[in-house]
Curated annotation (Swiss-Prot):
GO terms for molecular function: rRNA binding; structural constituent of ribosome; tRNA binding. Pfam families: Ribosomal_S13. Residues 93-122 are annotated as: Disordered. PROSITE patterns: RIBOSOMAL_S13_1 (PS00646), RIBOSOMAL_S13_2 (PS50159). It comes from the Bacteria. Part of the 30S ribosomal subunit. Forms a loose heterodimer with protein S19. Forms two bridges to the 50S subunit in the 70S ribosome. GO terms for biological process: translation. Belongs to the universal ribosomal protein uS13 family. GO terms for cellular component: cytosol; small ribosomal subunit. Located at the top of the head of the 30S subunit, it contacts several helices of the 16S rRNA. In the 70S ribosome it contacts the 23S rRNA (bridge B1a) and protein L5 of the 50S subunit (bridge B1b), connecting the 2 subunits; these bridges are implicated in subunit movement. Contacts the tRNAs in the A and P-sites. The gene is rpsM. Keywords: Ribonucleoprotein, Ribosomal protein, RNA-binding, rRNA-binding, tRNA-binding. InterPro entries: Rbsml_uS13_C (IPR027437), Ribosomal_uS13 (IPR001892), Ribosomal_uS13-like_H2TH (IPR010979), Ribosomal_uS13_bac-type (IPR019980), Ribosomal_uS13_CS (IPR018269). This is Small ribosomal subunit protein uS13.
Length: 122
């Protein structure tokens, strides 16, 4: 089983898809990575040679932050916004949508399950 950036790549998937299992590598970056290393996107991860794995590892480590480093950087950015008291930091602190989405309706994922309030008595 091929292992890159601390992630076991699925054996039977094409490399183009298998690389997207790494946090921080999506479809576009996966194609770019395969072009840089000269590996065919149709190759399965079980068929990779050690040299190809080493080439992939080198390009990933030298060009991009992925997995734990990227997650830490994102968390640090959120913490910084909260500390400086920006509007986005305030939204993060309150657990509300950060990027201007409406909250009168929707936003259930960010706000959590509905908290029912007793209706008005007649």
């Amino acid at each position: 089983m091929a292992r890159l950036a601390g992630v076991d790549l699925p054996r039977e998937k094409r490399m183009e898809v298998a690389l997207t299992y790494i946090f921080g590598i999506g479809p576009a970056r996966s194609k770019e990575l395969l072009e840089k290393t000269g590996i065919s996107p149709d190759l399965r991860s079980k068929d990779l040679s050690d040299e190809q794995l080493a080439a992939l590892r080198d390009v990933i480590e030298n060009n991009w932050k992925v997995e734990g480093d990227l997650r830490r950087e994102i968390q640090a950015d959120i913490r910084r916004k909260i500390e400086i008291g920006s509007y986005q930091g305030l939204r993060h602190r309150r657990g509300l949508p950060v990027r201007g989405q409406r909250t009168k309706t929707n936003a259930r994922t960010r706000k959590g399950p509905k908290k029912t309030i007793a209706g008005k008595k007649k």
